[in-house]
Structure formats: C-alpha cells, structure tokens
Amino acid sequence: MLMEDGGLDTTSEEYRKLSKAERRKRRRATPKYRNLHATRERIRVESFNMAFSQLRALLPTLPVEKKLSKIEILRFSIAYISFLDNLLQ
C-alpha cells in the first residue's frame, strides 16, 4: 500500500475499502507526511520564538541581557502596558 516515495497507493482496492478516518490515519503515518509535518511545526515554533524575542526587546529590564521565560515576558508585558496606560491617564 506504500509507494516507493513514501506516499500511499490510493488506487489500491485495499485503500478504497478503508473508512475515511482510517485513510487519514494511514496517510499521516507515512514518512513523507511526518517529514512535512515536522517541517511545518519547526517553522511554527521558530516563528513563535521570534515573536517572543521581538516582544522581549520592547521590555525595559535591568540588566538588559537578563533571560526571561515566556511566561515572564507575558506577565511583564501586561504590567508594562498597564504602567504605560496609567501614565497616559
């Protein structure tokens, strides 16, 4: 049922007898699908981390190079936004 390139042979009689859920499950088990999924996930995580880095760069902390966790960045951002909002009022 697997083809040489790692894809599924969707023309086989066996494949056509499978339920929709089983077809999806088998398709997701192919090396080709797993590699594509891993690549997409890696890009998503890199984008997520880049967004946190950009947000972190906007926050004033002492020392500047202090490493903050993601939750610390979010909490500090909320506090900083509140502080700036209070300054404007």
Curated annotation (Swiss-Prot):
Kindly give the InterPro entries that the UniProt entry links to this protein: bHLH_dom, HLH_DNA-bd_sf, TAL-like
State the GO CC annotations: nucleus
Q: MF terms per GO, please?
A: DNA-binding transcription factor activity, RNA polymerase II-specific; protein dimerization activity; RNA polymerase II cis-regulatory region sequence-specific DNA binding; RNA polymerase II-specific DNA-binding transcription factor binding
- Does Mitochondrion show up as a keyword for this record? no
Q: Region entry Helix-loop-helix motif: which residue ranges?
A: 46-84
Entry's localization field: Nucleus
Query: Basic residues bias: where?
Result: 22-32
Spans annotated as Disordered: 1-32
Listed transmembrane segments? none
Major localization class: nucleus
Annotated region Basic motif: the residues are 32-45
A GO BP annotation: positive regulation of DNA-templated transcription
Q: Does the keyword tRNA-binding apply?
A: no
Q: Which residues form the bHLH domain?
A: 32-84
Q: Which residues form a coiled coil?
A: none
* Keywords from the UniProt entry: DNA-binding, Nucleus, Transcription, Transcription regulation
Q: What does this protein do?
A: Transcription factor which binds the E box motif 5'-CA[TC][AG]TG-3'. Involved in modulating physiological aging, probably by regulating expression of branched-chain amino acid transferase-1, bcat-1.
Q: What is this protein called?
A: Helix-loop-helix protein 15
Q: Which organism is it from?
A: Caenorhabditis elegans
